[in-house]
Amino acid sequence: MPSTAFILKCLEFTDTGEEVVLVAWNKTENYIAAGGQTGSIRILLLDFNSLSEQGYNISDLRTSTRNVRILMDKKLSLHDNALITSIAWNEKETKLATSDNRGLVFISSTDTGKWVRNLVNDSNRAAVVTTTWSPDASRILMVYVNGLVMLGTASGHRIYNGTINKGSAPKFGLIASNAIEVFILAWGNAICCYNFSGEEVWSVSPLLATNSDNHFVHGCWGHSSESAQLTALSPSRDPACNGSSMPQIKINSFSGDSMTLIAVTSNGMLCVYSVLTGELLSSVSTEIIPVNVQLSPGSHMLCITGSVQSSDSNFGLHQLRGNQGVSGDSTKHTAIVVVYRTADLATISRLRLPERVATSSSWDSTGLRLVLAAGKNIYIATVRPSYNHYLMNDGTMAFTMSNYTSTILSTASFVDDTQRPPMNVGALFSKKTAEEAPSSAISSFEERILDRARCNECVLFWKPGLQAPYQRWPARMIAVVGCKSYIAILTLKTNTSGTRKHHTHICFYTSVCAPIFSIDLPYVPFYTAGSGNYLVCASSSRISVVDIRGLANEAIGLVDAENVSYVYEWHADSYPLAQDRELTVARLTVNNPIVGVACCDVALFVARQDERVQRYSLPSLTLLETMTIKPNQEYMQTNCNGTVLACLHEDGSLVFYYTQSYYSEFLYAHHNPAEQQQQKQQPAPKPPQAQAHLTLLDTDADTAAALGFGQDSVVETESAPYVIKNSVLKNVNVSSGELLQDSAQARSGGVSTIPPYSPELIGIWGLVFSPEDPNLVAVSSQYKVIVFHLDTQTREDSIQTSAHIIGFSGLSIIASYLDEVSHNISSLDHAYYVLETQMLRELQEIIFGQQQAPESFNPLVDAALNRGCLNKNMISLTSDSKSGVPSSLFDSVAPKTIAIKPVRGQQPVGDMVDSGLDVTASNSSQPSTQTSQALYSKDGQISINLAGAVEYVKSHPSVHLYRIVAEASLITLRLEVASYFYIRAGDYVSYNFCESLLRLQSQDQRRAEMLMLIGNFSSAEHVYKQVLGRPDLIVKTQTDLQMWLSIIRAAKLSRTPGGNLLIDDKLLEKAHKSIGLYYMRQQQYAIASDFLQKSGDPYLYAESLFAARRYAELKALAVSLPVDEFANCIAKVAVMLARLGDVEGASEALVRVNDPHSAVHISLQLKRFDIAAAIAGKHNILHIIDRELSVYLKQLLAAGDDQGALELLRKTKQGEVIAAVIINLVLKELQTIFVNRTFPMPPGLFSKLRRIIVLAGKEATYVQREQAKKNLQAHASAAPDCMLTEQATNAAIDTFINEDDNSKAVHDVKAKNTGKEASSLEHELENAQSRLRSVPVIWRIARQTRFIVLSSYMLYIGNPEQALWPAIEAANYYHRTNDSQSSADPCIQYLSRIALPIAAQAALLFGDFELASNLLELIEADTELPASERDQLEQMSVLIYSEYNITSVPSKRKDNYQINCGHCNTLLPPYCGMCEKCHWQTPICVRTGQPIKSDKMDKTVLCQMCRSLATMGKTHLSVCPLCHEPYQ
């Protein structure tokens, strides 16, 4: 619905007939001040909240209203016989500043209810033009007609005092807040901005300045965002102010950059200027003669008061004539108020007043009310904004709102006076502007308004009482359309590739704000409409019908969407079934543009510019008829079956147009009396011969007579029992509103068209059709809601409320105070109401009587609204709420259409279910006291006026009333009458229930079944148990109705001494499971776990524990469940524990179910490698963790965390395997280094590798010693009589270590032989993945890396002689010459090949050419030596051999270049440390890399970890140079 405004109250200013000229509304204290022509000042304090609406009771809303109450009325005598020229409020201190034409300025304030005046200035020389406060009330500005300007602070300190003369009197003045230090003065021909020194900063002239009559009239401050500084749209700035000497503006805060100025001119132009630069940001023609302009708080709306340009203008004329009390020629009343929406400058309302001119206006704090000054009266107006609200099928309300300031600035501006601003039509765009523009200008019109898409609005999805509102903030939103189960949000998309092209993205959301499916349109629609099955979008030249059902089935995978299009489009000048529609659909030129659309599930209405409306059938899109309507419609909506079209026109009138398919007996007889008389003269066909007569209860003959059942009433019972063929109710399908085929054939002639129906209403701001009854429509007009019956063109008594109507639920109207919601989201729970129609209220009073009608909804009305209560939630009905239990039987039942009917002061349904779960709190053997009070009189008989109810529904046919009467008949056990009305209501399920009750012989059993149906379970159980003596039927009925709490309560009572065991364990577990699942859906997991613990389903119990965050119990469940019966459940619980990070609990549970592989994988995924290694070692599956453990170790070692890596490895207790894994890391690094190596090699390249190998050696040594200790302890336990000393223990450990080394040595020999047979080194690397190395081999590899680093460093510092020993030792030169002693370990071979070039370089540099030649021969024999390295060595050799005498022996050799064997005293070759005869090896110092002589052995230190020797040197070593272990 479009937004609107209407007059709420009119107050006479004075008794003497003085005209009011100015008004001001205090937005903090709610005071209204008004000033008149002769100096009268009147202060009013108003209250808009009625007592009935504050009570939060649904029954009170029938008479509630937003009537205005005057709490205070004070008249001040300040300006006697003087014209009031300005009125302004200081809202922070509640001070009122007034001035007059005699130069007097007063400031009045109140203290304890008494108003005190203070004279501020008395200037007899000139009249005051303006006395105004700054927006933050920190400053005050006084402007006089002679140009005198007085500017000061609110406390009285002067800021500026001077005279500014422009040759004429100023029109108005404004003072800015603290954000920017400027003030504004406006003359007729210019608006000037001054700083606080009185220097002019900029000036602007009014648009169309060549017209001498155009001048500035009034202005106010505006607000905008930081991005609003745009390029000037016209050269209206004074060029004299430009230049380097231009005065500057002092800005105190960032918000000062975005301040704007709004001004109106005498020719009706509304202009927006930047305060900082004076640039024109936007302009629009108001088409009135403005006098005053005011911006609402929050800057959402703008109000302009004045008069129409001509007395015959139609603006607001319909609303003016509709107001009561307006007499005489309405053309003399030219006062008008125009309200704009600042987001897009769309017109909200044109409010015509019965006065000559509206001189002033002011907003209240909410921005929803206006006080107007016009003639001799003060008018209070209410603005009813549109929230684009819709009611979804599940009761969710969707509506739009904005929570921050809208901007009145836009990149697209309406400077052209020939174009009007966009109207609030459909979603956003202007229908009238599109109509007035020629077809060739349609595209340019779109370009101007596309950038006005709303980007600051939020779409809220709110299900009252059941959930918090969901929010969606779409970017560049165009429209929001309700489609019953979905909400379609249209957003604007722009394609900037090539030419600028716009398209529309449509996304459909569910009630929980979840996007479900979407579609794109290649154009931007102006008009939209939606139903449950279709979404219709249209521009002026194009129309599209989207099949929602097909999209929904595609989204959930029910259909194959390949080559299927769910959008049907055609051009406006074509028709849906045209053969060339696909070729012409994108054509922009159009002869008869589209100006509106409306649709339902079966019909589509398309309005054209020539005042015709085309009606198509859906889904066939066949043209059914063409209708003629009034021009300039703003809003269109159709009823549920597409037989009535409601149009709200631009003049404010509402018209209902009847289609040719619509039929009403009353309207047809009224408009076609002759044809109706002819039909009456035709004899009616005789009914078939009766086979059985319908007999009502013998005790109530009046009811039978009222129903019209006599001797001629018969029923056929062969095919279907009790199918009534004739009755007093006419054979018309009142639920559809369309004429049946037999009735249409009986009429003579064609179908007549019923004239349009136009109710005399003004200020219409809401219209909702019933989704079930096509004749029922609710209209919001001013402050009341009126229900119309279109079949009789009658209206019900109005319901006075200012709530927005959202939808229908049967005969109830769903309404919400969205105005309050838009200002405070926390008040959502108090803004939802259900209003009853007059028919529902009258039938309720007839059935129960006026004295017995309960305050809230009674059981019968609720039962009807819930469609027989066959789908109620039995858990909520059987729970025992302590404090929030509804007062009626069905208050806790959630109907189908709406989610809940909350009553203020009561608890929502979601909270009522949690009743403490005390199943023994209530006694089910006693009948309900509520039922006794509501249904039974004092003598125990049911007190229901059934005859009066039947008589009432005869004159008010409605399916909803039929259902209520059927429920009343069922409660009184008049089953024949109940069956009849259930048939009339179309409720065949309840009809079959009544027929099944008729087959029962016992009246008590019928009563018990009836009580079960209506929800009075305690009374039904009382009848079953006490009267019939059949407690088993109670259990059966409770099971069928899923009354699980009652079953649990009965089971607990039956297990007491003397109880009957009617409920077995299986049924009890099912009850606990159902209740637990219910609480899981309600997200009350703690309560759910208590029930699911006894459900026999441990997996559901585990899920509830997980959701309830009861993790200790979840872990205990995984340990306590039997493995044989619940293995799968234990595995699922282990996954839950893993999600919580409890690796120990998850792995323990998986090991219990014999799934160690999963336990290892989970431990690896959660980075618990110690647990993974322990489990893998225990179950002999270590091969599955090698890769993961290697990666993790690599990360630790790369980060330098050696201690962390060592601790992790020792926790695994698999030292030998882990050492092999570490060496594998070294192999990969060595392979990379060897391939990418350079010559000479940097010294620090092997530091990381050496550290890794040392770590492996430490781990292997540690594991070996731990195993030796275990063996020693085992040996000691075998010989308990022997005492082990420390010396014996160390000796035994050394013996075990030596034995282990010998066994590993034999293993290495075997591996060496195997390596000889290998074809390549790569194959040997692959086999090394699982090879275990002995501790000496690991430390040998570590020593190789140490010697490579040491020799490389010696070469780096220029000492080749010191590099020869460590390099040759690392290269295993003498081991390679003797093949029997060479090692097949791939790491040793890699390191040897890397060390050979270093040794050769050292020998060449030192001058030992013989040794260098031997080394080069070994290098040349290496086929894998890189060519670049080979060339470097050859060049170095040639260079050195050419410079030196190669036959000479080096003269600089030291004494230790050649040593004797320490065993056989054989002289060894130079730089050789191994004897070939006895295999004696020279000890090498790991600190210097040099051999240790026998006489120096006493000055060495032995490392207990790596067993390496190091000379002490000049300083004592504290740690081992190889493994960095402290010396002991």
UniProtKB/Swiss-Prot annotation:
The WD repeat ranges on this chain: 123-170, 244-285, 619-667, 759-798
Disordered: region residues: 914-933
Alphabetical GO biological process terms: intraciliary anterograde transport; intraciliary retrograde transport; intraciliary transport; intraciliary transport involved in cilium assembly
Superkingdom, taxonomy of origin: Eukaryota
Subcellular localization(s) per the UniProt record: Cell projection, Cilium, Flagellum; Cytoplasm, Cytoskeleton, Flagellum axoneme; Cytoplasm, Cytoskeleton, Flagellum basal body
SUPFAM superfamilies documented for this protein: Putative isomerase YbhE, Quinoprotein alcohol dehydrogenase-like
Keyword Cell cycle (UniProt): no
Bias kind Low complexity: ranges: 920-933
Coiled coil start-end: none
Keyword set, alphabetical order: Cell projection, Cilium, Cilium biogenesis/degradation, Cytoplasm, Cytoskeleton, Flagellum, Repeat, WD repeat
One CC-aspect GO term: ciliary pocket collar
InterPro entries attached to this UniProt entry: Beta-prop_WDR35_2nd, Beta-prop_WDR35_TULP_N, Quinoprotein_ADH-like_sf, WD40/YVTN_repeat-like_dom_sf, Znf_IFT121-like
Pfam family, one: Beta-prop_WDR35_2nd
Keyword Membrane found: no
Predominant subcellular localization, coarse grouping: other
Described function: Component of the intraflagellar transport complex A (IFT-A) involved in flagellar assembly.
Name the UniProt record assigns to this protein: Intraflagellar transport protein 121
